Amino acid sequence: MDALELKNIISDGLLSFPVTDFDQNGDFNKSSYAKRLEWLAPYGASALFAAGGTGEFFSLTGNEYSEVIKTAVDTCRGSVPIIAGAGGPTRQAIEQAKEAERLGAHGILLMPHYLTEASQEGLIEHVKQVCNSVDFGVIFYNRSVSRLNLDSIQKLTEMCPNLIGFKDSSGQIDMMTAVTQTMGDRLSYLGGLPTAEVFAAPYKALGCPVYSSAVFNFIPKTAMEFYNALRSDDFETTNRLIKDFFLPLIKIRDRKSGYAVSMIKAGAKIVGHDAGPVRPPLSDLTQADYEDLAALIATLGPQ
């Protein structure tokens, strides 16, 4: 799949990041992960991100990264495209991007570099080197210490033909308005804020109708119902789900740092698709929080 094909795929539909399965010792559970992908693939996501943030990308060793990407590509071949997470320091990101391309992934989401702040000149060089190391499509993840301004985005799109996507987790509406209005269809735009459904309508109004859904991991039917309602401007349905489900979900998520990932794994366990524990420094939900989440999920009915 070339970069333009990937751009077209991520320009429409719902995207998601499957959690990564670990056994009770915290080791990668390949068979359980494959079964998870087999369960999720038919629900209709346009693409799945393997080893993304929700997939605990930051906790995977080099060998595990390769295993996760290979398992995802092999399991979903012919059914749904796989986009691999890649990131950290420039040379590590290049190594991961090349490995993902070798294993048959259809592109990468370029995750933030680690820890250090960087100038716009440094970020441009970082993104350029990663893009130049591969032929397939690259989606830039605008978040944390890795944020590009409009001028930098314009320069990179001129230098890197395979930079085809911009995923925003900054929540800066003025910035996103400037980017979408200036860059037009040169890029595909993805909403990337936590619990993205709550922000989906305003992002759609900016020309960013696509987002990645974490809750697709445990309520895929409801996740698709929300997306389809958003797409058709069925505000009665989207507002009902935001009020009755997503806002209460955010209250649980915000009880502890790191719950944005831990809560998704807990949700998968509640619906019968246990992905095992999260790895430190994340912590699993407390029993009380787990029970609150289970009660909330139960209000949605079968998935």
Swiss-Prot record:
Matching entries from Pfam families are given as: DHDPS
Q: Matching Gene3D superfamilies, A to Z?
A: Aldolase class I
Alphabetic keyword roster:
Lyase
Query: What reaction(s) does this enzyme catalyze?
Result: 5-dehydro-4-deoxy-D-glucarate + H(+) = 2,5-dioxopentanoate + CO2 + H2O
Gene Ontology biological process terms from the UniProt entry: D-glucarate catabolic process
Q: In which pathway does it act?
A: Carbohydrate acid metabolism; D-glucarate degradation; 2,5-dioxopentanoate from D-glucarate: step 2/2
EC? 4.2.1.41
Question: Cross-referenced NCBIfam families, in alphabetical order?
Answer: KdgD, PRK03620.1
The Swiss-Prot or TrEMBL record describes its family as follows: Belongs to the DapA family.
Q: What name does UniProt use for this protein?
A: Probable 5-dehydro-4-deoxyglucarate dehydratase
